[in-house]
Amino acid sequence: MSKLGKFFKGSRSSRARAAPSAQEALARLREIEEMMAKKQEYLENRIQRELALAKKHGSQNKRAALQALKRKKRFEKQLTQIDGTLSTIEFQREALENSHTNTEVLRNMGFAAKAMKAVHENMDLNKIDDLMQDITEQQDIAQEISEAFSQRVQFADGFDEDELLAELEELEQEELNKKMTSMELPNVPSSSLPAQPSRKAGVPSSVHRSRAASSRRAEEDDDFKQLAAWAT
């Protein structure tokens, strides 16, 4: 291999080893964009100036007007080239930014995958199954204990609750009977009943009997009301 070939090969290998980072390349592209934007603004101003000169010398000095138009055309050509260059630089910068973003995403995903792998290395599926079974069994036991506490407690005293209730009803009935038998009846008036009025002439005897029966029922109702009031 010739010395010249070795020289170019060494230059390529050195450039490959010293490849710029994405951040450095992006910074340089942004610097170029700013420089080209300033150049673009300068050319636009020069174009407007030459156009004004051409209009100024149009009728008086055609030679000066033509020179101004020529300069204007050159500046417009340069401006067109700068526009194309800026478009290319913007495209390259956007592509590099996307590549840098994808690289960062891939790197972080790989980092997360390694962390997840390290976590899973300490896990055993059999141990997890055993743990879940233990948790389920303990939950069932806790549920049974809760149900046992919530159930009615039955004391082993040998007494039947139905018999006790029946005996209680008998005692209540006896107390009620005692009250009824010891109840004092209202005093009966000792005076003799008033004499019945003499039967008027023309009034039938059935009418007198009906009035007497109504009077007795009224007295009985009064006695019953007094008895009920005393009992309550």
UniProtKB/Swiss-Prot annotation:
Q: A GO term (biological process) for this protein?
A: protein transport
Q: Which Gene3D superfamilies match?
A: 6.10.250.1710, ESAT-6-like
Which residues fall in a compositionally biased region of kind Low complexity?
11-23
Query: What's the protein's topology in the membrane?
Result: Peripheral membrane protein
**Which residues does the annotated region (Intramolecular interaction with C-terminus) include?**
1-153
Please list the coiled coil stretches.
21-50, 125-182
Q: Which cellular component appears as one GO term in the record?
A: cytosol
Show the InterPro entries listed in the entry: Snf7_fam (IPR005024)
Q: Where in the cell is it found?
A: Cytoplasm, Cytosol; Late endosome membrane; Midbody, Midbody ring
Q: Name the domain of life.
A: Eukaryota
Give the record's PTM text.
Phosphorylated at Ser-210 by AURKB during cytokinesis: together with ZFYVE19/ANCHR, phosphorylated CHMP4C retains abscission-competent VPS4 (VPS4A and/or VPS4B) at the midbody ring until abscission checkpoint signaling is terminated at late cytokinesis.
* Modification type Phosphoserine: residues: S210
What segment(s) does the record annotate as region Disordered? 1-23, 172-232
Keywords for the protein's UniProt record, in alphabetical order: Coiled coil, Cytoplasm, Endosome, Membrane, Phosphoprotein, Protein transport, Transport
> Which residue ranges are recorded for the region named Intramolecular interaction with N-terminus?
154-232
Q: Which GO terms describe its molecular function?
A: protein homodimerization activity
Kindly give the PANTHER family that the UniProt entry links to this protein.
CHARGED MULTIVESICULAR BODY PROTEIN, CHARGED MULTIVESICULAR BODY PROTEIN 4C
Q: How does it assemble?
A: Probable core component of the endosomal sorting required for transport complex III (ESCRT-III). ESCRT-III components are thought to multimerize to form a flat lattice on the perimeter membrane of the endosome. Several assembly forms of ESCRT-III may exist that interact and act sequentially. Self-associates. Interacts with CHMP2A. Interacts with CHMP4A. Interacts with CHMP4B. Interacts with CHMP6. Interacts with VPS4A. Interacts with PDCD6IP; the interaction is direct.
Family, similarity comment: Belongs to the SNF7 family.
**Domain notes from UniProt:** The acidic C-terminus and the basic N-terminus are thought to render the protein in a closed, soluble and inactive conformation through an autoinhibitory intramolecular interaction. The open and active conformation, which enables membrane binding and oligomerization, is achieved by interaction with other cellular binding partners, probably including other ESCRT components.
- Free-text function comment from the UniProt entry: Probable core component of the endosomal sorting required for transport complex III (ESCRT-III) which is involved in multivesicular bodies (MVBs) formation and sorting of endosomal cargo proteins into MVBs. MVBs contain intraluminal vesicles (ILVs) that are generated by invagination and scission from the limiting membrane of the endosome and mostly are delivered to lysosomes enabling degradation of membrane proteins, such as stimulated growth factor receptors, lysosomal enzymes and lipids. The MVB pathway appears to require the sequential function of ESCRT-O, -I,-II and -III complexes.
Q: This chain belongs to which protein, by name?
A: Charged multivesicular body protein 4c
> Which gene specifies this protein's sequence?
Chmp4c
